[in-house]
């Protein structure tokens, strides 16, 4: 009797695997992480690649004060993809994570934690609380990075608070000081009155603020050159008109600056005369809503007004009229209110006139001092309204506009900042700026616009203010002579401080008096005295992180200087990229990195910045909980990270679908490799069918494209190549047309398909390993192994192109065969729509061919050609016929296949029942069943 249907099902080689369709990554990934940790994966990888060329990606240290966000995840995953790929490419690529641990945010958190006690707490006690806070967050962030699949030496990260780091930082400071690049001086700096400290340019962010834009007139008091008399203008009725948006700086006014190259006019309003740039008269009058005015006499060169005097608008003092090239005709009146204590240009131009004092009537908390007269005690922002009201009442204000403008804010407290001249420590960029330009030219910038951005920033920047008036940081290693006040920095003092810090850490600066630190025998170079005090400032945290090239690359035995790559977000052009570059060029004369790779910001699905208050943020922990870390990694790889990267729940949902297609490709192949032993079952190349060779050639193309993508860190190219290969080349074509051979046969043909699939999946898994680190290892665990294969896929070598390459003739042949197949599919779809057939195996196809097409198709065995079309029968006919197609010389006709349907393979055949024991099977299936 014939066997029943279920018995025939059991004779099929249907896919069988424990590799699950549903990934379950949120549960599986932690299990893998534990295995990696238990087996010391990172150190084993370093040992495995020992002796290979090094690739050093130097980690820019994130600030250790909170949970990671999507931007941090983007950054760390890009680095991890690079590290994993380089280790598989033939390098030993160590990854030493770092953490930036000093600075104001941690200090403020520490102060907040002690509440009212902060008034009584010592600096040393505060520093100990800060260190504890930073250390706790290092552990939290390290665990979060590892949860993303990031591998590295998390057991031994570099920390800017470590004694050995601080000691090396002091030495870098000393090297720069010895070369004359470090100095102390009075200069206007960015000052945060809320944080009560100076700020560097890298610590400034701009936001839109509203303010009053006012035109104020200052009465002329002296005309030593007789300019007014020469032009018949009465001095007692003449005023200079200035424009300002910082009313609070008027108490500090000491000068009005004109441009000596511009022409100025006398504008008569009523019986009074007002001096302003000729080209700006109309705009000033329009802004002040003055329609009745007259320009009197001929224009006068700005240079003629130099050293005239005027009365301050409310204080009992006179100011000077001076000249400066920074005065422009873009806005205002051409007469610039100049307060040397509150602006860089103002300060610089005042330096040319020794008689002009630098007045700073604002304390470190942003309150006006007694120098501001009756406004003393008012906060600068509040004083704007008071001063404006008084000046308006006195008639000094000619016009007023309420405007919105971009204004600098502190990036830590996010409040507006001021310019304030104070005694600070600076790095003199001007002294080695040309050397920095040369160093920039030696670096490979990715994207290449990075070169011009860095060059422009270095060109336009002022000297670097490196001192901060806070407690939690590396102290400025300077001593002061008690007798004359001169500061003292020598090779001996730098060595003494660095040795002390290396032994006890920078807390020692606060434990010991100056005499206990400074070497015996040191005397003041100015007065010869030998009694000392210590500096109370700390270094800018950008000097901390900017010293990593020395404190980490040069000190860690597994690393080296310079790094092959620094990779961070675009904001680091003014941050870590630049501070590292400056300290390296200043101390060593070269760049600290060979290449710089830059990524953009993470924004929401509409391209807007993420804010908690807007409710448009997405946290890595949420995505990991819902989808797993591999989906975040796929998001990184699928994005063009050189621009802003969009993230949101819809995007991750779409990516999970893309991931599923890649996973299911692997699952299908694994299912068909059940029982396959690559040590014994692989067939020789000459036993492969043509379509197997095509699949391997497609794999070779994939290897070429993905290797090219990895080489330039274009993971988006890698992702799209992998996705298209899995969906188009594999799922939609090769894996589909080989099903009959895999399911229904047991001979060489099946093993040929398995051999090709095995090679494909081994290579594919290696390709995706840097990106999908968890899934690739899961696939690897299920793959049948040869003795040469490692336990972990990341220990494997990346596939090399050429092993499966096909010549151009073969590729052209198969491109035409696929084109023919596409035309057949169109005709089958129409036959299905016309109810002639259901599944494509119900069809018989006749192909009408010219000689060239006939020869092409006839080169393929008819059973293989039928499998290619997924039909039961194919007939080739020379000549015209059937439906016209897009392939020249080809016509296609489809009909319902003749014969009966085989119960096992579902193909239609005339030989059904030729085996008496199996009346419902075709001859091939009956032979297979009988064995």
Identify the function of each model-found stretch.
Residues 189, 407, 478, 521, ...:
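Residues immediately within or flanking Cys/His clusters that coordinate Zn2+
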Residues 71-83, 90-92, 99-100, 165-168, ...:
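Structured ligand/cofactor/substrate-binding pocket environments in proteins
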Residues 2-272, 339-352, 357-372, 396-436, ...:
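N-terminal, positively charged nucleic-acid-binding surface of large information/translation enzymes
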Residues 100, 189, 193, 199-207, ...:
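Acidic, turn-prone loop/beta-hairpin segments
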Residues 196, 469, 485, 528-529, ...:
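Cys/His-coordinated zinc-binding microdomains
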Residues 321-322, 886-921:
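C-terminal accessory/binding modules appended to enzymatic or scaffolding proteins
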Residues 192, 410, 481, 524-527, ...:
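Short cysteine-rich clusters marking metal-coordination/redox-active sites
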Residues 49, 53-60, 70-74, 78, ...:
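Secondary-structure capping and boundary motifs in well-ordered enzyme cores
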């Amino acid at each position: 009797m014939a066997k029943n249907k279920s018995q025939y099902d059991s004779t099929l080689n249907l896919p069988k695997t424990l590799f699950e369709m549903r990934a379950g990554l949120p549960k599986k990934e932690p299990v893998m992480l534990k295995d990696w940790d238990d087996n010391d994966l990172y150190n084993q990888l370093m040992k495995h690649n020992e002796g290979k060329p090094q690739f050093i990606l130097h980690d820019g240290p994130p600030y250790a004060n909170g949970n990671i966000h999507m931007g941090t995840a983007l950054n760390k995953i890009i680095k991890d993809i690079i590290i994993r790929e380089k280790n598989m490419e033939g390098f030993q690529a160590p990854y030493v994570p770092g953490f930036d641990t000093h600075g104001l945010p941690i200090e403020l958190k520490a102060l907040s934690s002690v509440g009212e006690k902060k008034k009584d707490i010592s600096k040393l006690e505060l520093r100990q609380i800060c260190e504890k806070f930073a250390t706790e967050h290092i552990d939290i962030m390290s665990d979060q990075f590892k949860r993303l699949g990031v591998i590295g030496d998390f057991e031994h990260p570099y920390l800017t608070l470590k004694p050995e780091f601080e000691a090396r930082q002091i030495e870098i400071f000393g090297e720069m000081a010895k070369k004359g690049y470090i100095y102390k001086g009075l200069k206007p700096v960015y000052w945060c009155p809320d944080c009560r400290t100076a700020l560097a340019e890298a610590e400034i962010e701009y936001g839109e603020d509203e303010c009053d834009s006012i035109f104020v007139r200052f009465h002329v008091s002296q005309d030593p050159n007789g300019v007014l008399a020469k032009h018949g203008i009465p001095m007692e009725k003449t005023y200079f008109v200035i424009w300002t948006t910082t009313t609070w700086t008027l108490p500090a006014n000491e000068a009005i600056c004109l441009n000596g190259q511009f022409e100025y006019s006398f504008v008569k309003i009523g019986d009074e005369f007002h001096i302003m740039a000729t080209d700006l008269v109309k705009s000033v009058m329009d802004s002040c809503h003055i329609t009745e005015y007259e320009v009197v006499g001929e224009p006068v060169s700005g240079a003629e007004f130099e050293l005239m005097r005027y009365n301050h608008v409310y204080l009992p003092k006179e100011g000077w009229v001076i000249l400066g090239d920074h005065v422009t005709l873009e806005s205002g009146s051409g007469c610039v209110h100049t307060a040397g204590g509150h602006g860089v240009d103002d300060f610089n131009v005042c330096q040319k006139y020794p008689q002009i004092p630098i007045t700073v009537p604002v304390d470190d908390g942003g309150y006006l001092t007694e120098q501001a007269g009756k406004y003393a005690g008012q906060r600068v922002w509040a004083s704007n309204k008071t001063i404006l009201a008084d000046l308006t009442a006195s008639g000094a204000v000619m016009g007023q506009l309420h405007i919105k403008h971009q204004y600098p804010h502190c990036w830590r407290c996010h409040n507006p900042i001021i310019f304030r001249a104070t005694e600070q420590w600076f790095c003199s960029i001007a002294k080695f700026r040309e050397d920095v330009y040369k160093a920039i030219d030696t670096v490979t910038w990715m994207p290449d616009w990075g070169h011009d951005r860095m060059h422009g920033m270095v060109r336009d920047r002022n000297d670097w203010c490196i001192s901060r008036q806070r407690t939690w940081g590396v102290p400025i290693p300077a001593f002061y002579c008690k007798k004359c006040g001169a500061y003292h920095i020598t090779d001996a003092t730098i060595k003494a401080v660095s040795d002390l810090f290396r032994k006890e850490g920078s807390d020692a600066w606060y434990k010991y008096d100056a005499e206990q630190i400074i070497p015996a025998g040191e005397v003041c170079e100015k007065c010869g005295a030998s009694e000392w005090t210590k500096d109370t400032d700390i270094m800018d945290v950008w000097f901390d992180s900017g010293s990593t090239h020395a404190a980490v690359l040069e000190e860690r035995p597994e690393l080296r200087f310079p790094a092959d790559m620094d990779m961070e977000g675009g904001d680091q052009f003014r941050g870590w990229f630049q501070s590292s570059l400056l300290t390296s060029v200043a101390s060593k004369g070269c760049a600290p990195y060979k290449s710089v790779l830059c990524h953009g910001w993470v924004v929401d699905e509409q391209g807007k910045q993420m804010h908690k208050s807007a409710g448009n943020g997405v946290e890595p922990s949420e995505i990991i909980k819902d989808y797993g870390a591999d989906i975040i990694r796929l998001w990184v790889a699928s994005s063009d990270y050189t621009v802003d990267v969009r993230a949101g729940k819809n995007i991750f949902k779409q990516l999970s679908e893309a991931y599923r297609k890649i996973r299911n490709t692997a699952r299908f192949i694994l299912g068909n490799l059940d029982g396959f032993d690559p040590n014994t079952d692989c067939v020789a190349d000459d036993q492969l069918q043509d379509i197997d060779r095509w699949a391997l050639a497609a794999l070779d193309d994939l290897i070429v494209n993905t290797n090219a993508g990895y080489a330039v860190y274009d993971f988006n190219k890698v992702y799209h190549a992998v996705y298209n290969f899995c969906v188009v080349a594999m799922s939609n074509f090769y894996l589909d047309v080989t099903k009959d051979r895999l399911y229904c046969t047991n001979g060489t043909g099946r093993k040929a398909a398995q051999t090709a699939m095995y090679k494909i999946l081994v290579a594919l898994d290696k390709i995706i390993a840097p990106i999908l680190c968890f899934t690739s290892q899961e696939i690897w665990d299920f793959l049948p192994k040869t003795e040469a294969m490692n336990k972990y896929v990341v220990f494997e070598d990346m596939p090399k192109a050429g092993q499966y390459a096909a010549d151009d003739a073969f590729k052209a042949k198969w491109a035409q065969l696929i084109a023919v197949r596409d035309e057949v599919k169109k005709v089958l779809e129409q036959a299905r729509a016309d109810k002639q057939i259901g599944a494509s195996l119900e069809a018989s196809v006749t192909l009408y061919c010219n000689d060239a097409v006939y020869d092409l198709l006839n080169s393929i065995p008819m059973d293989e050609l039928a499998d290619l079309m997924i039909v039961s029968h194919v007939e080739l006919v020379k000549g015209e016929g059937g439906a016209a197609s897009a392939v020249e010389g080809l016509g296609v006709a489809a009909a319902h296949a003749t014969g009966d349907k085989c119960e096992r393979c579902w193909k239609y055949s005339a030989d059904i029942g030729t085996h008496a024991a199996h009346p419902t099977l075709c001859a091939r299936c009956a032979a297979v069943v009988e064995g």
